[in-house]
Amino acid sequence: MEKQTAIPLRERNIILIGFMGAGKTTIGQLVAKKLYRDFIDVDAEIERRQGMSIPEIFAQKGEAYFRKVERELIVDLCTNTRLKILSLGGGAYLQEEVRRACLAHGIVFFLDLSWDYWKEERLPLIVDSRPVLKNKTLEEVEQLFFQRQSAYALHHSRVVINELEAEQAADQIVESIKWMWDVYEPNR
C-alpha cells in the first residue's frame, strides 16, 4: 500500500463552505489576493468545463449529473493541487466524499450566517439565479438552510459573517490562517 505524504499546512488549499449567497466567491477572491494564491470558484470552473451555466446543466442533464461532476472536480482539486483558495457551491459539501477530501487535504472555513440575516439580506440578491431555489416556498428554503447546517458543522474554522463586509471577513480568515501556520508550523 502506498503511503501518502501529508501536505504541509502552509501549502494546503483553503476551502470556503457555506450556504448559497453567503459570499464565498467574493470573500475567496479577497483571501486569494491577500495570500497571493490562485482562486478557483468551483461552480464557475464547472461552467467553463461543461460549456454551459449551472441552471442549464440542471435543466439539461439534471442535478445528479451536476453533483457527480462537482464531486469529481472538488476531490481532484483537493488531492492534486496546493496553494489554492477554493469556493464550493452551497450544496457541494453535503456529499461525504467531498467533505472527506476537503477536511483531509485542505483547511476548511465555514462562512456562517443566521437564517434571518440570509433571508433579509442575501435571498433577494440570488433568488432568481439558483436552481435549487426554483419553485420553493420560503418555508422549504428555510428547511434546506437548517438541513445543511449539520454538514457545514464539519470544518476547521468558522467565521460568522452577519453584518461583516467582505473585506472584514477576508481579513479574519487570513489572520486565522496565519495564526494556524505560526502555531502548528512555526519557523517555516
Swiss-Prot record:
Keyword Nucleotide-binding: yes
GO molecular function, one term: magnesium ion binding
Top-level enzyme category: transferase
Claim: ATP-binding is one of the keywords in the record: yes
Free-text cofactor note: Binds 1 Mg(2+) ion per subunit.
Localization per record: Cytoplasm
Reactions mediated catalytically: shikimate + ATP = 3-phosphoshikimate + ADP + H(+)
First-listed, main subcellular location of the protein, grouped into a coarse class: cytoplasm
Positions of substrate binding: D43, R67, G90, R148
Binding sites annotated in the UniProt record for Mg(2+): T25
Gene Ontology biological-process entries: amino acid biosynthetic process; aromatic amino acid family biosynthetic process; chorismate biosynthetic process
Record-listed E.C. numbers: 2.7.1.71
Pfam families reported in the protein's UniProt record: SKI
Annotated Gene3D superfamilies: P-loop containing nucleotide triphosphate hydrolases (3.40.50.300)
Swiss-Prot/TrEMBL keywords: Amino-acid biosynthesis, Aromatic amino acid biosynthesis, ATP-binding, Cytoplasm, Kinase, Magnesium, Metal-binding, Nucleotide-binding, Transferase
Pathway info: Metabolic intermediate biosynthesis; chorismate biosynthesis; chorismate from D-erythrose 4-phosphate and phosphoenolpyruvate: step 5/7
GO cellular component, one term: cytosol
Residues holding ATP: G21, A22, G23, K24, T25, T26, R130
The protein's required cofactors: Mg(2+)
Record-stated family: Belongs to the shikimate kinase family.
Record's subunit section: Monomer.
Protein name in UniProt: Shikimate kinase
Organism, scientific name: Geobacillus thermodenitrificans (strain NG80-2)
Gene that this polypeptide is encoded by: aroK
